[in-house]
Amino acid sequence: MDTSRKNRIIKITIWVVCSIVVITALLAAAAFFWPAASKQLQSSSSEKLSYNDAIAAANRTVSGDTSNTDVRSECRSIIKTHGKKTAKAVMMIHGVSACPQQFADLGDTFFNAGYNIYIPRVPSHGLTDNKRHGEITIPAMAQFMNSSTSIISGLGDETGVVGLSGGANMATWITQYNSQTISRALLLSPFYQPSASETPSWKIPLLRNLYGRNIFPDSFTGSNLSYRALGKYIIIA
């Protein structure tokens, strides 16, 4: 092989290696520094509804769950009212991979105390294949939070929201962007980020950006929580 050809091969090899290094560095930088904010989460599009409109919207949600054979019967959205707008109403948002059943007993306690209650099913949750909670999307989460806030707005003169785990992340967002509607928030074990014992802090941007934005294929924790879903809840936080 002549010298000039060897030199060309060496140059091409160096160029390829350098390109791979640069691309890898850019991907790594994107994974760590990609902004967490998402356009759909920068404002709320909820609206204040009358009691009748809120009930109609809630009933449509429950009917949709009832007619959807993929939704487990115990996981349908729950609406319980006293037949009129009450002084206080509360919305409860379940945790990651759970469903409205998680708050059924607490909902009854509030209802018996005179509250109207609404416990909506988070999109992609409560399905016969529970691993499908990993299919949830940021637009679906934003639409869910906005429509649920609209419904609770018509159920009470004073409204609050209770959230557990990822549901507490949603409750945080709802309260932040709907302060004219929501006056109380109870946040139970919010999943703002994994505990240090479970995930080193340097891995959190990877979970948020690579799994939360569906760049990596989904994986599941030992307790069958979707990494993609967890990443999206961190984005909300």
Predicted segment positions?
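Membrane-interface motif at the C-terminal end of an N-terminal transmembrane signal
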Residues: 23-40
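Catalytic nucleophile-loop/oxyanion-hole region of alpha/beta-hydrolase
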Residues: 127-160
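The alpha/beta-hydrolase serine catalytic core
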Residues: 43-71, 190-237
